[in-house]
Amino acid sequence: MRGRASYFSSNKSQVLKSLLNKFLLFFFFASPVFAEGSSAALQEKFQDWSLFKTNRGDQIVCYLASTPIKTTGSILNRGESFFLVTNIKNDADEISVASGFIYKNNSDVELSFGSKKFYLFPYRILAWANEKSADIDIIKEMQKNADMVVTSVSSSGKIASDTYSLIGFTQSYKQLKKICK
């Protein structure tokens, strides 16, 4: 894990851009909102969070992205983990998380802020809140806390836990709301 942590600290911007482009590629096939040639441009970094922006036709799509500061669990061939807050043309914000593997069917992905917990709905490699009100509540918690922990189960039944720093989140979220009108 130590090698991975030092890799992220030195190359975090490049890693996040690569992850976002993979995310956009995934959604190119899964959603009509995203068009061919998706490429998000880094707008600003706010400590542990990065703000990206792209245009899809007449829609502005912005993302806040971060990678874990700590990972646990021994899952073979685990890919990169990341957490996103997506905003499309200043519409409702949506959170999503990828833990670097295919999630177990009929499992929940737990997002915790100390004793406060939320449960996300996983589909293949991504997980989302079940409703917009949960997205809103999660974003409020992200603004009040120093970190959050994502606990999930892989398709092989192994448990993984990723800790994300929330340092810089509030500032990056305010900027997202400002530039994504």
Predicted regions and their residues:
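Basic polycationic patches enriched in arginine
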Residues: R2-R4
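Bacterial N-terminal signal peptides that target proteins for export
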Residues: Y7-F23
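A generic "folded-domain core" signal
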Residues: A35-K181
